[in-house]
Amino acid sequence: MIYTLYIIATLGVTIFYTLLTQLYIRSRKKHNRLRSQYLRQVSAAVLADSDSLAIAITASSRRERLALADAIYTTASHCYDHNHSITALIAQENNLEKHLLRELRFATKYRQGLLWLQLATISPSHHYTLQLRQELHNSDPHIRSCSLIALLCTSPEESIKTLLELDFELQPYDISRIISLVRRGVLPFAFERLLQSGNYNLKLLAISIVRHFNLDIYTKYIYSLLGNKEHPKLITEVIYTLTTMKHPLNSPLLRRHILAMPPSQRKALCRHLSAEGYSLQALRWLLPNNEMEYAERLITSHKRQLSQSNRAQV
């Protein structure tokens, strides 16, 4: 009897969660259909820079508003120096700011981060700046990261002050998001100020920007950081930046820092150097003899050729 009840209960729970999964999948499909529809409309309005097309975009239900907010965020994330007044007009006509703020109260942690990003993109306002600054101290790294990007979007003129006041170290994901804002023209950084700052986060961001945009004129300054008593992570970023920019490897200072790395980090750097096209002879100068066999296998493997051919296509 007990065994039969156990089987029935198990089947009931299985059926319940199966139904929940099916409902969620159906809901996501509807959301994606609406989002695709709004993406076409928002993109057309932004490209045409047309107020009339923007006003024609309507969202009356909760599902439609969420899909429209997602579409505006996606469009803005892929546009460079676009006219924000068009997306702001769409948001205003559909009262998106009010509805997104209401969604924030009941959202899960992951969803909260996405809603902050959408809110900052759709309607960058100083009304919720204080709340965003409070979220920077959240223990959840996802919410913290999303809140930082949202705050930079809403108050770009205070971006350096915001980064200076952070009580956590920027992670690679944060850096890539900030660089995306720089590329899109959202953040008006005074770049020299970043490089000359004694703040870890600002200097890390500056080094990453040099690498990302291949700013050759700052190579000498970046190399000079190897001679300073910098944070170990900054030294690693400097090495990756110099090698990405094809800096010669025949430097005693560079070799000393690479030999001081833990073997696991040196192995990762070896993969990076191989992908960047450095020769086996150049690596012999940098790596210990017992690690040269691994470097030789990397350089002569087909993976290196695939990596370089993919970069050439991009």
Summary of predicted features, one role per range:
Residues 42-43, 53-56, 68, 72, ...:
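Generic structural signal of hydrophobic/aromatic residues within well-ordered alpha-helices
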Residues 74-75, 81-91, 113-124, 144-154, ...:
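Structural detector for internal amphipathic alpha-helices that build alpha-solenoid repeat scaffolds
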Residues 91-104, 125-136, 156-167, 184-196, ...:
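Amphipathic alpha-helical scaffolding segments comprising HEAT/armadillo-like alpha-solenoid repeats
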Residues 107-108, 139-141, 167-172, 198-199, ...:
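Short inter-helical turns and helix N-cap capping residues of alpha-solenoid HEAT/ARM repeat scaffolds
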Residues 293-294, 306-309, 314:
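Long, low-complexity regulatory tails in eukaryotic proteins
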